[in-house]
Each structure stands twice: as structure tokens, then as C-alpha cells.
Amino acid sequence: MLLSVPLLLGLLGLAAAEPAVYFKEQFLDGDDWTNRWVESKHKSDFGKFVLSSGKFYGDQEKDKGLQTSQDARFYALSARFEPFSNKGQTLVVQFTVKHEQNIDCGGGYVKLFPGSLDQKDMHGDSEYNIMFGPDICGPGTKKVHVIFNYKGKNVLINKDIRCKDDEFTHLYTLIVRPDNTYEVKIDNSQVESGSLEDDWDFLPPKKIKDPDAAKPEDWDERAKIDDPTDSKPEDWDKPEHIPDPDAKKPEDWDEEMDGEWEPPVIQNPEYKGEWKPRQIDNPDYKGTWIHPEIDNPEYSPDANIYAYDSFAVLGLDLWQVKSGTIFDNFLITNDEAYAEEFGNETWGVTKASEKQMKDKQDEEQRLKEEEEDKKRKEEEEAEDKEDEDDRDEDEEDEDEKEEDEEDTTPGQTKDEL
């Protein structure tokens, strides 16, 4: 069967538009994830990941992910996929993070490694290609890391991208394009974008200060100068402090015992401070001298800053003080639209019901605490009333005793008489 040229081109176009999905993990097959993910044995006390949807969720099955389960631990877990290079194509890295433990200090990022990584020996110093995701530690660190390894050096972004710091699930997306531009999205909304060359110090600067240039000796940068015609008034100089004219020597002052009496000093009302001549515009002012720049001979453009020869492993290599973070919905692809759609079909579908469940739990907890508080107050009031009743009974007994004593004493006296 022969196909027409337009139809053939259309089919080829559809094939070309098909997204390449290099890695996708949603943990929808129970414990089978343990066959795909490898624990590092570099340290014997790495923390353990467990499969969990957490204390609250939008869908108990769909929201299951890898959860950190031990406090104050390093974690090192990774999954391998078919190696690929992003040369000539877009790279999209996406995943969800939920810090349901209200994290105080810990990482929520991922690392992409080359195929040479020994997964069973993965650790904090293992060389990676890209590190991306949220990192929180106290009030001072709440950022999204975007770190590229360029020629063996880890290069941090020059911008500060703030991460989400609540207890809900959030979608993090990094897009790296072959035109050396990038985009960072949180919850499918752009929070940062720009040029790799501009926002990271991969390359030496294009321009440098001309080493042969120097500011001319007669270059005057003073906008104002002292008025040469101005002079200090003759009566300007007055002492800052003077003896108090109203002070009097105490009548009982004994100079032989107390020494010579000196009046206390006070601020001089006529003191004017240091005299300075008035300022006038400098007729020789030339402005601030700007060091001329020249092309940096060490600068060489690199059209392939974005590109890596090998991506083959996604790893969770992080530290957490308080455990409970859940990682889910991992995706590595070359298609921005597909990643956005995948985010909407996963995080986007369950986010509202997740919040509803959390709100319901919070309300139930609030009511429980109110009931417990009410019960505690009632018990305290009952105890107070019981103590008060006991005191009243004691007082009544004391009164009766006193009355009996008063009645008995006169009778005894009469009998004795």
C-alpha cells in the first residue's frame, strides 16, 4: 500500500513529536519498587526509605511514594535507567515532594548521575551531573538548588529561588534547553528562568577591566569642595563644657579633707561644634571614573553548557534531621508539554483532596483538644468544689465541737456546786 507524501510527512511528524520518557516512577506496584531502587552500602547507618502515602493524602494508592523514616540520618537510594544524552534536545526533570513532618532541616532534592556511578557505593561526594530540588534548614535556608557539574566542578545558581515550606505535596520541575536556557517551575508555574551562562559562573567573564588603563592623576571625582572664600567666624571657638554658674560649694565642704572644690560642668549653650567651611560645586568635577573594559582573552563561548554525554541514574542523596518527607511522581523526559500534563494528572488530581483531608484532620484535632481542655477544666472545677466542700464540713465540725464545749462547761460547774 502506497502512502501519499502529505500523509507520510504527517505520520513522520507524529512520530517525531512522540515524547521520550527516560525515567518514570509512581510506585503503583506495591513493594516491587525494591527491585528497581538500590540502597547504597557506603555507610552502614544510612536511613531507610519506606513506601507510604503519609498521614494525609488525596489518593491513598496514587500518593504512595518513598518516605524517609528515621530522624537525623543520611539517605542514599538510587534507580538506574537506560543511559541517554541530552545533546540537541530538551531535558526535563520533575518530581513531587511532601514535607508532611513540617521539616526543620533537611534536603528534598534529587541528583542525576552518569552511567559510571556505582549505586552501592553512592555517597555525598559521588560526582553527579545535576542536583535539583528544595532544601530547608531553619529560617535562613529555604531554597531550590539548581547545581550543574561543569568540567568537574559543581556550579551553583547565582539567583535565590525560594522553595515551598508547608506540609503539602509540591511539584518541582527543571527544564534545560539546547539553546542554553533554563526554567524552574513549582506546581506547574514558572518561578525562575534565564540563561545558563548569565545565571551560573560556568565561564570566565566576557569582559575584564583593561589592565593597561589607569585613572588620570588629575581626574577629580569630588562633586563638592570646600568654599575657599569661606572662613571661620572669630567667635566660633567655644568650649563644649563649662562650669555650672549656678553651682555653689556645699557649706560643709572641708578643703583639707575633701580637696579643692570644683563646680560641676554643664553643656555650653554657646558651643557650636567643629567648624567646617560651606560646600560648593567643584568646577573641576569630572564624575566617577569608570575603568574601561576589554574583551577577556580567556573567555571562550560554549554552546554545549547544557549538554551531558550520559544520564543513567536518579538518586536521593540527602540528610534529614526530622524524617517524614515523601518523594513521588519522578519523571525524566525531553518534552515540556508532556511533563506539564503528567504533573497535572498526578499532583494536580490529588492536591485538592489532600488539603481537604489535612483540613479535616486539623479540625478533628482542634475539636479533640477543645474537648480534652473542657474535660480537664471540669475535673479541676470538680476537684476545687470537692476541696471547698471538705473545708465547709471541717468548719461545721469545728463549730459543732465549740458549741458542745460551751454547753458542757456550765453543767459541770452546777453539779460541782
UniProtKB/Swiss-Prot annotation:
Compartments where located = Endoplasmic reticulum lumen; Cytoplasm, Cytosol; Cytolytic granule; Secreted, Extracellular space, Extracellular matrix
Organism's domain of life? Eukaryota
Stretches the record annotates as N-domain: 18-197
Disordered, as annotated region: 193-277, 350-417
Q: Where is this motif: Prevents secretion from ER?
A: 414-417
Query: In Gene Ontology terms, what is one molecular function of this protein?
Result: carbohydrate binding
Task: Report residue spans for region: Interaction with PPIB.
Answer: 237-270
Question: Region (P-domain) spans which residues?
Answer: 198-308
| A GO cellular-component term linked to this record | midbody
Chain residues that bind an alpha-D-glucoside: Y109, K111, Y128, D135, D317
Q: Where is the composition biased (Acidic residues)?
A: 252-261, 380-408
Segments of skewed composition (Basic and acidic residues)? 207-251, 352-379
Signal peptide from the UniProt entry: 1-17
Work out whether the entry's keyword set contains Nucleotide-binding: no
BP terms from Gene Ontology: ERAD pathway; protein folding; protein stabilization
Which Cys pairs does UniProt list as disulfide-bonded?
A: C105-C137
Tell me which family the UniProt entry assigns to this protein: Belongs to the calreticulin family.
Q: What does this protein do?
A: Calcium-binding chaperone that promotes folding, oligomeric assembly and quality control in the endoplasmic reticulum (ER) via the calreticulin/calnexin cycle. This lectin interacts transiently with almost all of the monoglucosylated glycoproteins that are synthesized in the ER. Interacts with the DNA-binding domain of NR3C1 and mediates its nuclear export. Involved in maternal gene expression regulation. May participate in oocyte maturation via the regulation of calcium homeostasis.
Q: What is this protein called?
A: Calreticulin
Annotated source species = Cricetulus griseus (Chinese hamster)
The coding gene here is CALR
